[in-house]
Amino acid sequence: MARYDNIPEFETDLDGRGLRVGIVMSRFNQDVCEGLLSACTAELLRLNVSPELMRIATVPGALEIPLALQTMARSGRFDALIALGAVIRGETYHFELVSNETGSGINRVGLDTGMPIANGVLTTEDDDQALARMQEKGADCARTAIEMAKLLKQLQ
């Protein structure tokens, strides 16, 4: 039963059995991205997502993630998508541009297609921050993707 003034609440669990999950991962800052991927896929497996129902596409950098997500979302082959990448501040304005455009693009794809997308693109000041956050963020994206896929199915 709901926790909110006796109003019925949509309830989901984190059992990913039968869900088809697509992952788009940037190859830029590869060590961090592969750490995100490792944590993400380990959590997907823990949540009963079959390896046969997971697919990964790699792209050169963070700015290419939204287009790959959009194509996957429109394919009808996935129940949820996950974006993985790392944008680490340098000495130029490029960090803000890449961070803002990537985040905006990921959100736009989700809203335009109705596809749940977990955003696991880290934006950090330095490599140490990215390395410190990659495990938890990767696992969190897996949980978010499963929860939102199941919630959206209930809402329809």
Swiss-Prot record:
GO molecular function: 6,7-dimethyl-8-ribityllumazine synthase activity
Pathway(s) of this molecule: Cofactor biosynthesis; riboflavin biosynthesis; riboflavin from 2-hydroxy-3-oxobutyl phosphate and 5-amino-6-(D-ribitylamino)uracil: step 1/2
Protein name: 6,7-dimethyl-8-ribityllumazine synthase
Similarity comment: Belongs to the DMRL synthase family.
Keyword Transferase annotated: yes
Gene Ontology, cellular component aspect: cytosol; riboflavin synthase complex
Enzyme category, top tier: transferase
Highest taxon above the source species: Bacteria
Xref: Pfam families: DMRL_synthase
A biological process term (GO) from this entry: riboflavin biosynthetic process
Gene that produces this protein: ribH
Transferase in keyword set: yes
Keywords per UniProt: Riboflavin biosynthesis, Transferase
Residues engaged in binding 5-amino-6-(D-ribitylamino)uracil: 28, 62-64, 86-88, 119
Function, as annotated: Catalyzes the formation of 6,7-dimethyl-8-ribityllumazine by condensation of 5-amino-6-(D-ribitylamino)uracil with 3,4-dihydroxy-2-butanone 4-phosphate. This is the penultimate step in the biosynthesis of riboflavin.
Binding site for (2S)-2-hydroxy-3-oxobutyl phosphate: 91-92, 133
Reaction catalyzed: (2S)-2-hydroxy-3-oxobutyl phosphate + 5-amino-6-(D-ribitylamino)uracil = 6,7-dimethyl-8-(1-D-ribityl)lumazine + phosphate + 2 H2O + H(+)
EC nos: 2.5.1.78
Catalytic machinery residues: 94 (proton donor)
